[in-house]
Amino acid sequence: MPKAPNRETFVAHCSSAVYQPHFQSFLRNDLGLDHYALIALPGGVQALTLESLLPKFSWAGWRWIKFLMDLDSPSRVILIGHDDCRWYHRGPIGQMLGPERARQEKDLRRVAQDWKQRFPECAVSAFYATLASGKVAFDVVR
């Protein structure tokens, strides 16, 4: 009999094809997740921070998340960003200044805080992935 899907965890990360297998491996092997709700967008959670620059992106993103959160009521949320994100380089926020990792970690922290305010029953964790020599390291973002 197949294992029942895990409705206790929600994951949000970038849709990067390069990082997909690494995200999946991390979630499965390091965090022990076989099933989870997922939203994957270019830039990951960054779209959720664009209230003033691209308000429709932010509104739609939070609307999709609310739908999925209401559907399964997960108690755990995992947010993942990654190094060399093309959305951060070439997307609508590419003109913003500052090191990419610092910007992404700031966005991850902000979305984690917003998530906790919107869904206070959830534990939210954020990670930043870096790829070097074919291996990916996932650092906790605090």
Regions found by a protein language model. Give the residues of each.
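A generic structural signal for alpha->beta connector loops
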Residues: 32-35, 121-123
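Short, conserved beta-strand segments within well-ordered enzyme catalytic domains
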Residues: 10, 37-39, 78
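Short Gly/aromatic-enriched secondary-structure transition segments
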Residues: 24-31
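A short beta-strand-loop structural module common to alpha/beta enzyme folds
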Residues: 34-44
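Divalent-metal-activated hydrolytic enzyme cores
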Residues: 1-23, 42-60, 67-74, 86-142
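Histidine-centered catalytic micro-motifs
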Residues: 76-84
